[in-house]
């Protein structure tokens, strides 16, 4: 008996260590993707004034659209590959490829090279979300995923928050050359790729531990689903399908601010300068650190693992914030603009992380978590194309009117699913739920 308890204790300690390690390295990996993702949005400020590389706003918008289209294709594709080959292979390849593409963009300033590299960046960066969410799902049980993924989802808010001023400082304060936005960002991603190689594993079984949740094993002779079969299975799940549509409607606003925030601020407030124009939109991402944590706690603790109520309420508040943003900019008050950016960050990043992370994993089940998450994020990435295109072709008033309408529609779509819970959901276990180690509970 003592030997059995000792084995359980060692197993629990090992699992806890790996859970912390996986949480940290996957958090860093996705945050790192934002350095190469935000490099072009910062470089736009210098490119617009560089006579040797003439790109107008519409051309920049077209490049963003190329990137986002490739990103959308990758989201649909890499989720299936993560299920088939594991997170390690898919995400590590994405990190290395993204860094290489950024190095090329910082070295060769021609439109054909930029166009090709934006496509490569889209495909490379889209390896991250579905694979890393699957990685987290493998190490954490259903009852705790809401708050765990809520905390973990701060990675992309933090990544965007740090990446933009970092690239702006390197490009316009350290070197006065927009190319450094790409080169410095590539260096960060390469460093994280090295850490990922040494510290990441795809699932507990890869380090000799049992799965955190016991699931019925498929028959030994069951055929392995192909790519199209896995996607069709996701499409037949009404929860996953509605999540995909809602994410399609939500994503344009976020990406317009991410990709065009510095340009929008600089055009209306040129007196504050390029570095400050790159920093002001960071209020959106500072708030994004809190949004996923708050919505994750709310969904698990207040709504009993129901993901939709917290999303609906947050999206309603986002609708109001988006409607007020243009009047705030017309007032000329920088403090009011920053305050609304902060409010938009809280109310957008929360449902963004919940819809694309915990909800997609829960309703997709662990067997096809990567595929379901990839499908939902692929839908969002198609919507994000509008976020990259619209600010380059239309005035700010029109753009934010569209975003207000899409946020409202997304909230209304989720209302009928208010009481939905994932099939695997159960009350937080005290002595019986979960896999072998979780079933035993923490050794006393």
Give a label for each model feature:
Residues 117-157:
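Cytoplasmic helix-loop-helix junction between adjacent transmembrane helices
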Residues 21-55, 257-262, 352:
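Extracytoplasmic
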Residues 152-204:
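Helix-loop-helix hairpin linking two adjacent transmembrane segments in secondary transporters
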Residues 52, 86, 107-112, 175, ...:
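Helix-breaking motifs and short loop linkers at transmembrane-helix boundaries and internal kinks
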Residues 73-111:
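Conserved MFS/SLC helix-loop-helix module at the cytosolic interface between two early adjacent transmembrane helices
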Residues 96-109, 316-330:
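C-terminal ends and interior cores of transmembrane alpha-helices
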